[in-house]
Amino acid sequence: MGKIIGIDLGTTNSCVAIIDGTQVKVLENSEGDRTTPSIIAYTQDGETLVGQPAKRQAVTNPKNTLFAIKRLIGRRFKDEEVQRDANIMPYKIIAADNGDAWLEVKDQKMAPPQISAEVLKKMKKTAEDYLGETISEAVITVPAYFNDAQRQATKDAGRIAGLEVKRIINEPTAAALAYGLDKEVGNRTIAVYDLGGGTFDISIIEIDEVDGEKTFEVLATNGDTHLGGEDFDSRMINYLVDEFKKEQGFDLRNDPLAMQRLKEAAEKAKIELSSAQQTDVNLPYITADATGPKHLNIKVTRAKLESLVEELVNRSLEPLKVALQDAGLSVSEIQDVILVGGQTRMPLVQKKVADFFGKEPRKDVNPDEAVAIGAAVQGGVLSGDVKDVLLLDVTPLSLGIETMGGVMTALIAKNTTIPTKHSQVFSTAEDNQSAVTIHVLQGERKRAHDNKSLGQFNLDGIQAAPRGMPQIEVTFDIDADGILHVSAKDKNSGREQKITIKASSGLNEEEIQKMVRDAEANAEADRKFEELVQARNQGDHLLHSTRKQLEEVGDKLAADDKTAIDDALKALESALKGEDKAEIEAKIQALVQVSGKLLEASQPQPGAEGAADDASARRDDDVVDAEFEEVKDKK
């Protein structure tokens, strides 16, 4: 069995880890970083950039640079949270034909899983470069409070990226695995507070150790899938925009370029204020009007930032109370508090969490890497590389069906350990009813339409009978990924209908297959582009070295030979301006052939001088390889 990699697909940053022997290793990407910005950009010349290269060009290409896509994955366009984002994001969020939230980039409609797949492809490539083998399987993490549609959309993203998603695992649970695996923790109850770039989760987890086997059992989970660092950034951006408007009378919200610069500066200032008491946000030439250029220079203190975001931090405390209540525990029974997610580096967050639990959070868990490490551990469990670890996760929200009077009747309660299966018998609401509609719901509200609709199907062919007589057995079966399978069976006739819930929204099989094909086509285009760049680099070096030799020993050549070399140089120079790799390679070969006379002229006699030239030639070869690698990294 091949390696199963662990991927933390984050809102702001993503990370990939593997089991390497007995150790878990977080891998560096082609830019040398252990985390990759979850940013995708589509350039004017048709190139797709992912990670740091995409982030670097965001200011000049705001409408085609996509970030925080995880906040849209598996969501409906009309969702309140999506509408909120649609008003502030520089890129265009649209309604798909099925009502999902999609994006429009350069007049092309794209689904969030399709875009997230680009990040997953980079994670896959990072692992392949390190291991030197093809990777096809992964464990991918999601916020614990993700619903069924969001989980399914994440699996779709994996498929589009060319990965078989062996397991979807909750982020706080993954962090608990990272924390508990290499420590002699004994039996402990821990709280994992996970405040990332776009989502917030709290999980109460019990770690038991019996005869060397560790069991990680999630007792309760809660959260908010639309609360994270992006919201903190927005508060800072709004403050800076308002201050600038007061000073200059100019509203930067109408200038996408200025807003992109401001977003970058706000995020940087927020990070700086975790270690400094104040910082300057200084953006010269932020905009201009008839009176000339305008400069933004605003001093922000840590106290000011805290006053802007305190309400957001307080919003995270309510789910803590609910999770403890659901677990049947008091604060004093929590032995360790683990902080996960970059936003937990903020001193105010750490203080509020410490005050709530009455103890300082642990500092020995890397908030950026713990989730990917846990995912890799789960991958190791599935592949058999990791023994003596058992993970018992839960479903975050209740699952049920709509019954008479528009009521939600739960079949599986929230915080039920998964995988699980539950059946319940229902009947008809009217006499001689020949069909029933099974409307599957997820949520905690009593009124059916206040919950998330996951889908519906009909069971027909029910034998005529008075209301209340037919026996319709509805079975809910949740797999280890937290994805739901529902069946309804008429016990009298034996007729049965089954569906795997993919939500009333989501991508259908045909759309996923098309996106997989598109991704494969892009991979081929990327490979051809890399080969073209390699040929250009070789051509450039050959031009440079040949011209240098021509200057040094050209006067020793016959006029015809010199003319032939000059012509070949011009032909190669012309080919390098084009896009035809075969043409470039042909001109390289032509120049190599005619420049043989140069080599003879520069090596009139064998010996030390010739050896030195050989060494120089070898160095030139090394340079070609190194530069090709560098260009490839930038892709």
From Swiss-Prot:
Belongs to the heat shock protein 70 family. The modification Phosphothreonine is found at T199. This is Chaperone protein DnaK. It comes from the Bacteria. Keywords: ATP-binding, Chaperone, Nucleotide-binding, Phosphoprotein, Stress response. One of its GO terms (molecular function) is ATP binding. It comes from Pectobacterium carotovorum subsp. carotovorum (strain PC1). The keyword ATP-binding applies. The keyword Chaperone applies. Induction: By stress conditions e.g. heat shock. CDD domains: ASKHA_NBD_HSP70_DnaK-like. PROSITE patterns: HSP70_1, HSP70_2, HSP70_3. Signal peptide: none annotated.
